[in-house]
């Protein structure tokens, strides 16, 4: 249901569209409304998620809409995000607790920011080899919800980067790749 319209930005009472955040780009897709389809070109927000759509549309607050995400794009982001967790976890283990302090996830490439470390070519080759080895093993990837306290009880604080997350976020998604957990 449409709850707010400002220019070409539409807020809904609920959405499956992922907004820009956590180093990951937003979902694209369409909204199907009573007067046709609208292309969703950008999604932003925290408390209120705003879907940017084509400039010309006929919608009013209270209209019922359904959304369809571009699943190919979403799935590419999911795979890149999982790969980021794998690389970050292995780097942490190989290089004395190096922290991932940022990342940027796209459909076809990603960037991971580590601190404190200056990688040598030899270190990068070792990291690449370990990551490729884990991928070749076809390890199972699972996720689970845990609270901050539960995570802090099983993982060292420097591993979780809990200090980089807003304090109001209490429930977190924990990714397990094989036996290795990351968040």
Regions found by a protein language model. Name each.
Residues 1-183:
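Active-/binding-site microenvironments in catalytic and ligand-binding cores
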């Amino acid at each position: 249901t449409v709850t707010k319209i400002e220019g070409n930005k539409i807020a809904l009472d609920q959405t499956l569209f992922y907004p820009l955040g956590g180093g990951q780009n937003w979902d694209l897709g369409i909204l199907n409304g009573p007067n046709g389809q609208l292309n969703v070109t950008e999604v932003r927000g925290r408390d209120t998620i705003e879907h940017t759509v084509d400039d010309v549309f006929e919608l009013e607050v209270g209209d019922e809409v359904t959304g369809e995400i571009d699943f190919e794009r979403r799935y590419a982001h999911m795979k890149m995000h999982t790969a980021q967790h794998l690389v970050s976890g292995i780097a942490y283990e190989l290089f004395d607790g190096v922290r991932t302090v940022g990342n940027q996830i796209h459909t076809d490439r990603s960037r991971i920011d580590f601190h404190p470390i200056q990688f040598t070519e030899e270190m990068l080759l070792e990291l690449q080899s370990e990551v490729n080895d884990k991928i070749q093993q076809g390890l199972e990837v699972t996720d689970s919800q845990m609270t901050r306290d539960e995570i802090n009880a099983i993982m060292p604080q420097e591993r979780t980067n809990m200090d980089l997350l807003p304090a109001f976020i209490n429930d977190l998604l924990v990714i397990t790749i094989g036996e290795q957990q990351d968040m």
